[in-house]
Regions:
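Terminal, non-catalytic protein-protein interaction segments that mediate quaternary/complex assembly
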Residues: 1-146
Length: 146
Protein backbone atom coordinates (compact mmCIF):
# COMPACT_ATOMS: atom_id res chain seq x y z
CA UNK A 1 0.00 0.00 0.00
CA UNK A 2 1.17 3.54 -0.70
CA UNK A 3 -0.46 4.79 2.51
CA UNK A 4 2.08 6.19 4.99
CA UNK A 5 2.58 4.63 8.40
CA UNK A 6 1.94 6.47 11.66
CA UNK A 7 4.18 5.94 13.52
CA UNK A 8 6.70 5.13 10.79
CA UNK A 9 9.82 2.98 10.75
CA UNK A 10 12.16 5.59 12.26
CA UNK A 11 10.00 5.51 15.40
CA UNK A 12 10.65 1.79 15.77
CA UNK A 13 14.40 2.41 15.67
CA UNK A 14 14.51 5.35 18.11
CA UNK A 15 11.84 5.15 20.81
CA UNK A 16 14.11 7.26 23.03
CA UNK A 17 13.75 10.21 20.64
CA UNK A 18 10.16 9.87 19.51
CA UNK A 19 8.09 8.68 22.51
CA UNK A 20 7.67 12.22 23.86
CA UNK A 21 5.76 13.26 20.72
CA UNK A 22 3.12 10.51 20.73
CA UNK A 23 -0.46 11.55 21.40
CA UNK A 24 -2.95 9.64 23.56
CA UNK A 25 -3.66 7.24 20.68
CA UNK A 26 -0.01 6.07 20.50
CA UNK A 27 0.36 7.94 17.21
CA UNK A 28 1.90 11.21 16.16
CA UNK A 29 -0.48 14.05 15.40
CA UNK A 30 0.96 13.80 11.89
CA UNK A 31 4.00 12.40 10.12
CA UNK A 32 5.94 14.01 7.29
CA UNK A 33 4.98 11.04 5.14
CA UNK A 34 1.28 11.68 5.72
CA UNK A 35 1.63 15.31 4.71
CA UNK A 36 3.79 14.45 1.69
CA UNK A 37 1.36 11.72 0.58
CA UNK A 38 -1.52 14.20 0.52
CA UNK A 39 0.35 16.47 -1.93
CA UNK A 40 2.68 14.31 -4.04
CA UNK A 41 0.22 13.50 -6.84
CA UNK A 42 -0.33 17.20 -7.55
CA UNK A 43 3.42 17.77 -7.79
CA UNK A 44 3.85 14.82 -10.17
CA UNK A 45 1.01 16.02 -12.42
CA UNK A 46 2.35 19.57 -12.49
CA UNK A 47 5.90 18.46 -13.37
CA UNK A 48 4.66 16.24 -16.20
CA UNK A 49 2.38 18.94 -17.60
CA UNK A 50 4.68 21.93 -16.94
CA UNK A 51 8.28 20.70 -16.37
CA UNK A 52 9.60 24.22 -15.78
CA UNK A 53 6.94 25.11 -13.21
CA UNK A 54 8.06 26.99 -10.11
CA UNK A 55 4.94 25.86 -8.22
CA UNK A 56 5.88 22.27 -7.41
CA UNK A 57 5.78 22.58 -3.63
CA UNK A 58 5.09 20.15 -0.83
CA UNK A 59 4.35 21.92 2.43
CA UNK A 60 4.95 20.06 5.67
CA UNK A 61 3.94 23.04 7.78
CA UNK A 62 0.18 23.53 7.80
CA UNK A 63 -0.47 26.97 9.26
CA UNK A 64 -4.06 26.12 10.15
CA UNK A 65 -3.09 23.05 12.15
CA UNK A 66 0.36 23.89 13.47
CA UNK A 67 -0.07 27.55 14.49
CA UNK A 68 -3.03 26.61 16.68
CA UNK A 69 -0.76 24.57 18.94
CA UNK A 70 2.43 26.66 19.10
CA UNK A 71 3.79 26.78 22.62
CA UNK A 72 2.30 23.44 23.63
CA UNK A 73 3.45 19.85 23.26
CA UNK A 74 2.69 19.95 19.55
CA UNK A 75 5.09 22.08 17.55
CA UNK A 76 5.68 23.68 14.20
CA UNK A 77 7.44 20.98 12.18
CA UNK A 78 11.19 21.19 11.76
CA UNK A 79 10.85 20.52 8.03
CA UNK A 80 8.81 23.26 6.38
CA UNK A 81 8.82 22.60 2.63
CA UNK A 82 10.15 20.77 -0.40
CA UNK A 83 10.27 22.54 -3.78
CA UNK A 84 11.00 20.68 -7.01
CA UNK A 85 12.55 22.62 -9.89
CA UNK A 86 13.54 21.23 -13.30
CA UNK A 87 16.58 23.09 -14.58
CA UNK A 88 19.14 22.23 -17.26
CA UNK A 89 17.58 18.80 -17.84
CA UNK A 90 17.64 17.73 -14.19
CA UNK A 91 15.17 17.72 -11.32
CA UNK A 92 16.45 19.52 -8.23
CA UNK A 93 14.98 19.63 -4.76
CA UNK A 94 15.13 22.66 -2.47
CA UNK A 95 14.47 21.50 1.08
CA UNK A 96 13.85 24.08 3.82
CA UNK A 97 14.00 23.34 7.55
CA UNK A 98 13.48 25.81 10.38
CA UNK A 99 15.43 23.60 12.81
CA UNK A 100 17.33 20.31 12.89
CA UNK A 101 19.00 18.27 15.63
CA UNK A 102 22.18 17.12 13.89
CA UNK A 103 22.68 14.11 16.20
CA UNK A 104 19.22 12.54 16.12
CA UNK A 105 17.40 13.78 13.02
CA UNK A 106 19.75 15.13 10.35
CA UNK A 107 20.59 11.78 8.73
CA UNK A 108 16.97 10.68 8.51
CA UNK A 109 15.89 14.07 7.15
CA UNK A 110 18.52 14.05 4.39
CA UNK A 111 17.76 10.43 3.48
CA UNK A 112 14.03 11.16 3.22
CA UNK A 113 14.65 14.24 1.06
CA UNK A 114 17.00 12.33 -1.26
CA UNK A 115 14.58 9.40 -1.60
CA UNK A 116 11.76 11.86 -2.30
CA UNK A 117 13.85 13.50 -5.04
CA UNK A 118 14.65 10.10 -6.58
CA UNK A 119 10.99 9.05 -6.43
CA UNK A 120 9.68 12.21 -8.09
CA UNK A 121 12.40 12.06 -10.77
CA UNK A 122 11.56 8.41 -11.52
CA UNK A 123 7.80 9.10 -11.70
CA UNK A 124 8.31 12.03 -14.08
CA UNK A 125 11.10 10.45 -16.19
CA UNK A 126 13.53 13.18 -15.20
CA UNK A 127 17.19 12.92 -14.27
CA UNK A 128 18.10 13.45 -10.62
CA UNK A 129 19.83 16.76 -10.03
CA UNK A 130 20.91 18.46 -6.83
CA UNK A 131 19.50 18.51 -3.31
CA UNK A 132 19.75 22.00 -1.82
CA UNK A 133 19.19 21.80 1.93
CA UNK A 134 18.65 25.00 3.92
CA UNK A 135 18.52 24.78 7.72
CA UNK A 136 18.00 27.91 9.82
CA UNK A 137 19.04 26.34 13.15
CA UNK A 138 21.31 23.28 13.03
CA UNK A 139 22.03 22.25 16.59
CA UNK A 140 22.81 19.43 19.02
CA UNK A 141 22.16 18.80 22.69
CA UNK A 142 24.68 17.87 25.39
CA UNK A 143 22.62 14.77 26.23
CA UNK A 144 23.48 13.33 22.79
CA UNK A 145 27.25 13.57 23.22
CA UNK A 146 29.25 10.84 25.01
Amino acid sequence: SRRPLNPGHSFLERHDVWDQFLNGLAKFDYTYSERIFAQIDNVLKELVKHPDSRQCMIMIWDQHLDNAVMGGKKRVPCSISYQFVHRNGKLNLIYYMRSCDVMTHFGVDVALAWKLLEYVARCTNMKVGMLYHNITSLHSYKRDWP
